[in-house]
Amino acid sequence: MTPMRKSNPIMKMINHSLIDLPTPSNISMWWNFGSLLAFCLILQIITGLFLAMHYSPDTSSAFSSIAHITRDVNHGWIIRYLHANGASMFFICLFLHVGRSLYYGSFLLLKTWNTGIMLLFLTMATAFMGYVLPWGQMSFWGATVITNLLSAIPYIGTDLVQWVWGGYSIGNPTLSRFFTLHFTLPFIITALTTVHLLFLHETGSNNPCGISSDSDKITFHPYYTIKDILGLILLLFILTALTLLSPDLLNDPDNYTPADPLNTPPHIKPEWYFLFAYAILRSVPNKLGGVLALFLSILILSIIPMLHNSKQQSMMFRPLSQFLFWLLITTLLTLTWIGSQPVSQPFILIGQLASMTYFTTILILMPLTSLIENNLLKWT
């Protein structure tokens, strides 16, 4: 008799995606982050739903509604901190997932890669709008600075900013629409994640060697379900420790002061996971140039498949490219640090040098190094 997972139409779909899925036998723990991201997304949606039940998207009561959730709602404090720190874990997994794809050449699965970039943009937009909702000082001024960047667009910039704000300054309409979008976007992200998986299962996963694994595949369950559960336990351990022992470690103290349009904080900065892009934005003296650099810092990922000219897909056996990859990671960490510092010397200069290194490494050094490696191996 045929098992139900193979005969039932819905179960059959789940079976092909999670149970009998043919998977390369040599994929490492770096392939765990896809399932961890799915867990983070589910966690964010569940905790977000409970928070939305008590949150008030109104400038006069938003801040006090957050205080009410933390103090008065049963287990409200843990729901709030799981949501806030869950976002940080989400981005850690997201950056590691993208980093793994760059290192092992998974970006050559074009459809999967491009939907992944769209997911990254949507997640960043969702997180930014979520940062505005507590209506603290950093929420208000962060939203003011970032939305004001649209005014750099020639001709329509000012109108666009006022359209986003819903008035001549950030206020009630802005908070209301940001809450609506912050609530809706995770469901769009979930739908796009399904498309992302659909494209991945069309081609099959890449593997560390970057070679075809058609001749050596195993079923996803039980081998990789066990492996994913191990990753999940580690993630839960870190998230629980962060939430229970140091819940405000990654938050900004300024956000515990209610929003005041008449009092500017000494140093306006976004959440830690946007600091690298914020540092690139600040390193360009021209406003429009800064905005373009900001968007290009993420959009550059979409042209990486076109810049790939190595005879090997993975960097596993390419030491020169490996050096540049780790240079890129170091540059991003430097930019994250610079983004958290005030706009003064030597931080301005370090930020400009790091931004230049970031774009030069991806656009010039990596393709050149691939050509050198091809010649060293006498493959051309």
From Swiss-Prot:
Annotated positions binding heme b b562:
83, 182
The record, for PROSITE patterns, names: CYTB_CTER (PS51003), CYTB_NTER (PS51002)
The cofactors required by this protein are: heme b
Q: Where are the transmembrane segments?
A: 33-53, 77-98, 113-133, 178-198, 226-246, 288-308, 320-340, 347-367
Pfam families, alphabetized:
Cytochrom_B_C, Cytochrome_B
Please provide, alphabetically and separated by semicolons, the GO molecular function terms listed in this UniProt record. metal ion binding; ubiquinol-cytochrome-c reductase activity
Q: What positions does the entry give for heme b b566 binding?
A: 97, 196
**Entry GO terms, CC:** mitochondrial inner membrane; respiratory chain complex III
Location(s) in or outside the cell: Mitochondrion inner membrane
Residues noted as binding a ubiquinone in the record, renumbered to the chain? 201
User: InterPro entries of this UniProt entry?
Assistant: Cyt_b/b6_C (IPR005798), Cyt_b/b6_C_sf (IPR036150), Cyt_b/b6_N (IPR005797), Cytb/b6-like_sf (IPR027387), Cytochrome_b (IPR030689), Cytochrome_b_C_euk/bac (IPR048260), Cytochrome_b_N_euk/bac (IPR048259), Di-haem_cyt_TM (IPR016174)
Give the record's cofactor note, including how many are bound.
Answer: Binds 2 heme b groups non-covalently.
One BP term from GO: mitochondrial electron transport, ubiquinol to cytochrome c
Q: Its function?
A: Component of the ubiquinol-cytochrome c reductase complex (complex III or cytochrome b-c1 complex) that is part of the mitochondrial respiratory chain. The b-c1 complex mediates electron transfer from ubiquinol to cytochrome c. Contributes to the generation of a proton gradient across the mitochondrial membrane that is then used for ATP synthesis.
User: Assembly state and interactors?
Assistant: The cytochrome bc1 complex contains 11 subunits: 3 respiratory subunits (MT-CYB, CYC1 and UQCRFS1), 2 core proteins (UQCRC1 and UQCRC2) and 6 low-molecular weight proteins (UQCRH/QCR6, UQCRB/QCR7, UQCRQ/QCR8, UQCR10/QCR9, UQCR11/QCR10 and a cleavage product of UQCRFS1). This cytochrome bc1 complex then forms a dimer.
Of which family is this protein a member? Belongs to the cytochrome b family.
The name on file for this protein is Cytochrome b
Give the classification, highest ranks. Answer: Eukaryota, Metazoa, Chordata, Craniata, Vertebrata
